[in-house]
Amino acid sequence: MRKLTILKPDDWHLHVRSGGELQSVIGMSSAQMGRAIIMPNLSPPITSVEQALIYREEILGALPNGHTFEPLMVLYLTDNTSVKEIELAANNEFIKAAKLYPSGATTNSDKGVTDVSKIYPVLESMQKNGMPLLVHGEITHKEVDIFDREAAFIDQVLEKTIKNFPSLKVVFEHITTKDAKDFVLSCKDNVAATITPHHLLANRNNMLVGGIQPHYY
């Protein structure tokens, strides 16, 4: 075999940032991918339909000449996200999901959700409108070991959330543990997960033995 032809793939979790960073990286994605789910954790974050549409235009304007690429926009959930905003997003053709970042869990997550119960009305609206919830699944409590954060999130947050909203479409993003895999497989078909290739091939020993190897992070 000398040649393998595949359909142009999509990227289901993409950070392109904004400004100069966007200009630097977008071409590498648009050269290979047809569409991408665009992460909304900018500073400030993309919390409204209006902001998402402006950001979409910025991305399209940064594409290299001749590239065709469709950014699929996502809202960043906060404690103050309104049901009205979710309804607007659910009825907008360019916005495909909303993202749950536990406050303090990752880059630009300081304005994320402090307690998932605070957004239950929002989740109810998302369930009603068929809008997917993308989840960064990590507990940030200091007493939880950093390598147990994903499993603790399942036990303390995600399991209860799915029980309360059984028809909500949920994507547990970039999972890293057997706990997460087993949990998703135990759920109904409206709960799914994404996993990166390096998390299939490497573990924390690859990252830490002989000194920190950051590219295995």
Locate the predicted segments by residue:
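Short secondary-structure boundary/capping elements
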Residues: 17-21, 50-51, 81, 114, ...
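Divalent metal-dependent hydrolysis catalytic cores, especially in the metallo-beta-lactamase
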Residues: 11-12, 25-50, 66-78, 94-108, ...
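Short beta->alpha connector loops
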Residues: 18-21, 77-81, 174-179
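N-terminal cationic-hydrophobic initiation segments that often serve targeting/anchoring roles
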Residues: 30, 56, 60-63, 90, ...
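Glycine-rich loop at the start of a catalytic domain that most often binds anionic cofactors/ligands
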Residues: 49-57
